Amino acid sequence: ENVANDWMKLRQRMMTLLQEEAELEEIVKMVGMDALSPGDRLKMEAARSIREDFLHQNSFHEIDTYTSLEKQHNMMRLVLAFYDAGLDALKQGADINDIVKLPVREQIGRYKYTKEDQLAAEYEKVTRQLAAETAELLGKEGL
């Protein structure tokens, strides 16, 4: 609450996604990833992004060794923005495979390597890229 008004809400959403991922892992072990609904596949991808992009930290990288609260907050917002945009695209009929292949996912993952003095500008850039790629995806699929 000292960092941002929505910190606890974002944190709780991420924790929920990780818990749901653990439950879905049991299904995947029994019948495979293809048995999951597109929404559940997106949930698995979002949880993977939380684990790999947000929670994983490289202690030997000069920028990633220390992560400010502002950067953590922005990273939470980016991961969840991708998840929300993906859910919206699915509701509009987009294909899950196209959603998870959006190039912006790599940019979200690289955000943790952003220098502190460039956080705001890079956050805006990635947010605009997510909006543009999602709009293009929906336009391309005629949705």
Which ranges hold each PLM region?
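Conserved catalytic/coupling modules of large nucleotide/cofactor-utilizing molecular machines
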Residues: E1-L143
